[in-house]
């Protein structure tokens, strides 16, 4: 089975313009993401809509493909990139361009989901720990996931799901395992073509979570598990946290 990694990277981010080109420990954020992915998948490309990002990727020796500025989601950008790249890839892996510390173990966990021939789409979760403050669970920028017994996603929400009616909130993390969604997706190539042709759904628009479009249309999302904490960079403040993490790790 052949896996193609695509890293969507936009220049015009609302909260952090030029984020992929921000420097982190002497390298751009997009270079760090690319280097984490290279070698784990059969091939990897950055998919961008900006010539500055294209030039930066070529400068460090990475592969890059130009895509439209009109895409509403990273999945749409992945599909255009996939059609331009070509090849006989079975699965396309969508790696967030703002996750410079994505780990090989996480990519391998998503790949393992496709050992099940019925898997259409796969993603990752990380369990919240019982000692985390309740505010972490309440964070609307950290979507939660509920799963069925077969490790398929039932629903994703920015709200806390499930709501424990008969327990104090301070005890929720002790009485139930909550899962944080990690925004790493993989799709069988033919499924990627299908889901990008779907119109936006009511649940997707309500939560601003594109994966709800797929669930609402009957697609199954297989979930792999990771114990690695991710550090996404959405704001300049997040970049400072990433710099501290990098210093402490070295």
UniProtKB/Swiss-Prot annotation:
**GO biological process terms held by the UniProt record:** CMP-keto-3-deoxy-D-manno-octulosonic acid biosynthetic process; lipopolysaccharide biosynthetic process
**Which EC class, in a word?**
transferase
- EC number from the UniProt entry: 2.7.7.38
Reactions catalysed, as given in the entry: 3-deoxy-alpha-D-manno-oct-2-ulosonate + CTP = CMP-3-deoxy-beta-D-manno-octulosonate + diphosphate
- Enumerate the HAMAP family for this protein: KdsB
Family the UniProt entry places it in: Belongs to the KdsB family.
- Name of the molecule in the record: 3-deoxy-manno-octulosonate cytidylyltransferase
Q: What is the lineage of its organism?
A: Bacteria, Pseudomonadati, Bacteroidota, Bacteroidia, Bacteroidales
């Amino acid at each position: 089975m052949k896996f193609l990694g695509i890293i969507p990277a936009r220049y015009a981010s609302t909260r952090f313009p030029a984020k992929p080109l921000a420097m982190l420990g002497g390298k751009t954020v997009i270079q760090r993401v690319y280097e984490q992915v290279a070698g784990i998948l059969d091939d990897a490309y950055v998919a961008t809509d900006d010539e500055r990002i294209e030039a930066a990727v070529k400068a460090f020796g990475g592969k890059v493909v130009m895509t439209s500025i009109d895409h509403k989601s990273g999945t749409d950008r992945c599909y255009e990139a996939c059609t331009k790249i070509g090849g006989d890839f079975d699965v396309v892996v969508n790696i967030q361009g703002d996750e410079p510390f994505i780990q090989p173990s996480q990519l391998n966990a998503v790949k393992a989901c496709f050992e099940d021939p019925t898997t259409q789409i796969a993603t990752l979760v990380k369990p919240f720990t019982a000692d985390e403050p309740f505010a972490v669970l309440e964070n609307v920028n950290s979507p939660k996931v509920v799963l069925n017994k077969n490790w398929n996603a039932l629903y994703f929400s920015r709200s806390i799901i499930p709501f424990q009616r008969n327990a104090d909130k301070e005890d929720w993390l002790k009485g139930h395992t909550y899962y944080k969604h990690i925004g790493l997706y993989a799709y069988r190539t033919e499924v990627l073509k299908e889901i990008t042709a779907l119109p936006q759904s009511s649940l997707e628009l309500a939560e601003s979570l594109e994966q709800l479009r797929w669930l609402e249309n009957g697609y199954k999302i297989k979930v792999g598990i990771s114990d690695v904490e991710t550090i996404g960079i959405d704001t300049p403040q997040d970049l400072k946290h990433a710099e501290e993490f990098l210093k402490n790790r070295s």
